[in-house]
Amino acid sequence: RAALRLLTQARIPGLVPDVSVPEGAPIARLTLAVHAPELDDAPVSQGLLVAPAPADERPVAAKALSHLTIKWPWLADQLPPHTHLLRLSYGRHGEAEPAVTVEGALRDIRTLTGVTIAAEAVTDRLLARWNGTLPPLPPEYRSRVGALEDQVRPLGGVALTGAWVAGTGIASVVSHARAGAKGLL
């Protein structure tokens, strides 16, 4: 949003930024280290996504579960036997900041994997929160951003980048930023 504000305030002749960056969602990610031999067989492989539904119809509060020690085996190599790292993601666009507890996460894990993990099996936890993450960007938004990039390109010495241009995810943003920087050289 800041870059878009700067472009608008610069009053560049012919530049018409027809882009409105959508409001993001408050997100919480709870990562649990658990001693759970029952997870050694990876009941949900690397993880799963939970389809959106009205809050009162959801079987779980989480929107995703990642079995990090299956997704990235090098993590498992760093941990004691039968220790697993599970990351649960909470928060959806248009909803209030999610209330996240270890107890609630263990219920979600049981529902999603069929594995019951006792609270005493949780050996560590980390809760990270942030606001303003972008929702999935629709094609019409991407078209508007593309048109804005076309307007900025002839100015020389300026490239647009960031999640609002490249899409979400570090890989998308980094590769887009590198391409933009290369175009400036």
Describe each PLM feature range.
Residues 1-86, 91-98:
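Mid-domain catalytic core of redox enzymes
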Residues 65-185:
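Conserved flavin/dinucleotide-binding core of flavoenzymes
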